[in-house]
């Protein structure tokens, strides 16, 4: 299948010819996401390369950290690991494959189709937080795993994925042990966004940006205490668990 290139003002996509029409929609989504994030974050990447893959095998071959991460996450989140980001680039499955990956529960299709926006948001967080990737290497990947709740969680919230995650969150709470707070890598790519959703409700979007852009020396505990105005971590954890339960039980 021949590869072609489609461009927009700030993105250049390489993809199979069969995905030509769908990629135009991906670039439109990315331009809208860029415009929104430019209002919130101090720095936005220049032109970003978007590589749209027609199969899981092609994506995994191009981005070998992704299969490693998939083995670490809970089954409820695995279907949403559909791409990767690097310095000046994002790799993602084609929309037709994203739809095939989705389950039949409410919101699953929408979450996967927002994956390009979430990957771009992870790139933006990394550009604004020098201690987070990109670039990736063994040490940076290990740090990403430790802070996935923050980088991936911020991306879920800023891209709009969290608003569609109710059914997937409910499945995760039914099927596995109680999640950690903040969520470990097993749950970060599904539940991380709920931490930012809670913070946005209590402190506003600016607090979410600040949390995403700063890694204090005291680790996650210090980051969360500062974000929630010094509130003891156990109180924030209790509030988050209540928020998680409400999210999972809310009507679509």
Tell what function each PLM region has:
Residues 4-22, 100:
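Acidic/histidine-rich, surface-exposed loop or edge segments in extracytoplasmic proteins
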Residues 17-31, 106-115, 145, 149, ...:
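Soluble non-cytosolic domains of exported or imported proteins
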Residues 18-76, 113, 124-127:
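Zn2+-dependent metallopeptidase catalytic core
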Residues 27-34, 121, 152, 156, ...:
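Extracytoplasmic/secreted envelope proteins and their assembly/folding machinery
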Residues 34-41, 119-120, 124-132, 158-163, ...:
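Sec/Tat-exported extracytoplasmic proteins
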Residues 37-53, 131-138, 169-170, 207-214:
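Surface-exposed patches in mature extracellular/periplasmic domains of secreted proteins
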Residues 75-167:
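Zinc-dependent metallopeptidase catalytic helix centered on the HExxH motif
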Residues 178-252:
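Pan-zinc metallopeptidase signature
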């Amino acid at each position: 299948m021949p590869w072609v290139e489609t461009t927009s003002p700030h993105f250049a996509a390489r993809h199979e010819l069969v995905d030509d029409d769908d990629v135009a929609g991906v670039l439109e989504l990315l331009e809208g996401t860029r415009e929104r994030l430019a209002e919130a974050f101090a720095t936005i990447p220049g032109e970003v390369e978007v590589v749209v893959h027609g199969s899981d095998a092609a994506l995994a071959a191009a981005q070998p950290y992704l299969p490693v991460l998939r083995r670490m996450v809970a089954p409820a989140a695995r279907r949403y690991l559909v791409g990767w980001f690097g310095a000046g680039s994002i790799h993602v499955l084609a929309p037709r494959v994203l739809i095939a990956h989705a389950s039949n529960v409410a919101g699953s299709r929408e979450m996967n189709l927002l994956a390009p926006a979430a990957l771009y948001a992870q790139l933006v967080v990394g550009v604004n937080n020098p201690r987070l990737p990109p670039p990736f290497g063994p040490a940076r990947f290990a740090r990403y795993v430790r802070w996935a709740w923050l980088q991936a969680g911020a991306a879920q919230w800023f891209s709009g994925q969290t608003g569609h995650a109710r059914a997937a969150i409910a499945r995760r709470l039914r099927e596995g042990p109680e999640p950690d707070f903040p969520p470990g890598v097993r749950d970060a790519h599904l539940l991380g966004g709920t931490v930012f959703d809670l913070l946005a409700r209590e402190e506003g979007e600016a607090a979410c940006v600040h949390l995403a852009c700063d890694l204090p020396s005291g680790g996650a505990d210090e980051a969360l205490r500062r974000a929630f105005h010094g509130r003891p971590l156990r109180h924030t954890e209790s509030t988050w668990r209540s928020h998680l339960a409400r999210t999972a039980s809310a009507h679509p």
